């Protein structure tokens, strides 16, 4: 018996080179349009980013826009503020303010309580000293304090500040002495910078 004759088959293509898309053309076109629309929707979405604060809950960031037609989300207590501020700090400053916004001076008890908060232990002494100086020279301006304006109290100007804790007044001689020190320090700094610049230039010339 003779050997069976083998028939030659054409070589099969390599599977790794087959990159034919099995999706119909119409379905592929519809899928591309849907993906483009979804991408545009994600880009146009005005979702505010989330900010991690000291609070355990995530809060959205409020966007501040300068355009008058844009509406900015705000709380009910922020409607009287001219610009974004911290409400707690704003109320704290209002509580410590010795004079009201209408220019009316506060009562001595309230002023004493404010001074006791600002400088504990010196409130009574500063009040007694201010009263004695007012009786002694009512029109003479006191160093370190605002002069009183004739014609009524001025908002924020008729309140006398407590004396510094150190009790040392700054004189014109002190100012001139400090100015001389600053001038000498600047001259030394300029000389040091000039010497460093010359040294670097010499090093570059010798190295080149």
From Swiss-Prot:
**InterPro entries, per database record:** MBD2/MBD3_p55-bd, MeCpG-bd_2/3_C_dom
Location of the protein in the cell: Nucleus
Q: Where is this region: Interacts with MBD3?
A: 1-89
- List this protein's GO terms for biological process: DNA methylation-dependent constitutive heterochromatin formation; negative regulation of transcription by RNA polymerase II; regulation of chromatin organization; regulation of transcription by RNA polymerase II
Q: In which tissues is it expressed?
A: Detected at low levels in several somatic tissues. Highly expressed in the ovarian teratocarcinoma cell line PA-1.
GO MF, one example: methyl-CpG binding
Write the record's keywords in alphabetical order, separated by commas: Nucleus
Gene Ontology CC entries for this record: nucleus
Q: Which domain of life is it from?
A: Eukaryota
Additional observations? The MBD3L proteins are encoded by strongly repeated regions of the 19p13 chromosome. The exact number of functional copies is unclear, and some of them may represent pseudogenes.
Biological role:
May displace the NuRD complex from chromatin.
Outline the subunit composition: Interacts (via N-terminus) with MBD3; the interaction is direct. Interacts with MTA1. Interacts with HDAC1. Interacts with HDAC2. Interacts with RBBP4. Interacts with RBBP7.
Q: Which family does it belong to?
A: Belongs to the MBD3L family.
Name-wise, this protein is Methyl-CpG-binding domain protein 3-like 2
């Amino acid at each position: 018996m003779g050997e069976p004759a083998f028939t030659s088959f054409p070589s099969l293509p390599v599977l790794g080179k087959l990159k034919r898309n099995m999706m119909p053309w119409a379905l592929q076109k519809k899928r591309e349009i849907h993906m483009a629309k979804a991408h545009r929707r994600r880009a146009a979405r005005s979702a505010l980013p989330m900010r991690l604060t000291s609070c355990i809950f995530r809060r959205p960031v409020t966007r501040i826009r300068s355009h008058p037609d844009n509406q900015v989300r705000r709380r009910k207590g922020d409607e009287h503020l001219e610009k974004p501020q911290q409400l707690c700090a704003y109320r704290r400053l209002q509580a410590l303010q010795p004079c009201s916004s209408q220019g009316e001076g506060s009562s001595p008890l309230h002023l004493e309580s404010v001074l006791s908060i600002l400088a504990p232990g010196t409130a009574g002494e500063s009040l007694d000293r201010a009263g004695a100086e007012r009786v002694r020279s009512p029109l003479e301006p006191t160093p370190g304090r605002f002069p009183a304006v004739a014609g009524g109290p001025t908002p924020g100007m008729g309140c006398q500040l407590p004396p510094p804790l150190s009790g040392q007044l700054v004189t014109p001689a002190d100012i001139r002495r400090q100015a001389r020190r600053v001038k000498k320090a600047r001259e030394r700094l300029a000389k040091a910078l000039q010497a460093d610049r010359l040294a670097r230039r010499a090093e570059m010339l010798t190295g080149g």
